[in-house]
Amino acid sequence: MSRIVLASNNAKKLVELRRTFEGADTEVEIVGLSEVSDAPAPEETGRTFVENALIKARAAAHETGLPALADDSGLEVDALNRMPGIRSARWSGPHAHDERNLQLLLDQTFDLPDERRHGRFVCAMAFVDPDGTEITKVATMEGRIISEARGKNGFGYDPMFVPDAQPGDLTSAEMTPEVKDAISHRGQAVRAIVPAVVAHLEGR
């Protein structure tokens, strides 16, 4: 069985990524970064989601000697020039956390009319093998920003984002994990990268 390290110390993201990857029925053991390394997280200096995902995956592969899978995700709001974008996790400042980021999103969008509330979640997945192989995939989940937080599931901006790809009007934070995984940017990106990763590992 092959082992892959997930380059994330975000517990909720780790659970979501592991659940989605393992749901693909592959002979791969997923280990969290903190289980195999105490190295500090690399500085995310990239200008795109893909660049930042590669920075994290390369660092994890280098530190652990294991193939590494990393994601860089964020919210783009069209009316805010696609902000917060790659700064989604740190948007509200050096001590940013979900509640502060949500409040900032509310402050920035409270007076937007419905027709200007479109946005999307973006996820870039990067796989890096110490042998030099690199694979990347990008996926999005389109939707709209609402004017209040709803729901307790998920994390980040989920409580204020209503995905288009659903029959109802639930926020990402009101969906069950199974429903969210089926349509989410991260679920799509993981499902896109899994076949390429498995093919690479089987061909080593």
UniProtKB/Swiss-Prot annotation:
Protein's name according to its UniProt entry: dITP/XTP pyrophosphatase
Family, as annotated: Belongs to the HAM1 NTPase family.
Cofactors: Mg(2+)
Example GO BP: purine nucleoside triphosphate catabolic process
Binding-site positions, substrate: S8, N9, N10, A11, K12, K13, S73, F155, G156, Y157, D158, K180, H185, R186
HAMAP family to which the protein is assigned, alphabetical: Non_canon_purine_NTPase
Keywords: Hydrolase, Magnesium, Metal-binding, Nucleotide metabolism, Nucleotide-binding
Pfam families cross-referenced by the UniProt entry: Ham1p_like
InterPro entries in UniProt: dITP/XTP_pyrophosphatase, ITPase-like_fam, RdgB/HAM1
Keyword Metal-binding tagged: yes
Known partners and oligomeric status: Homodimer.
Catalytic residues (positions): D72
Lineage: Bacteria, Bacillati, Actinomycetota, Actinomycetes, Propionibacteriales
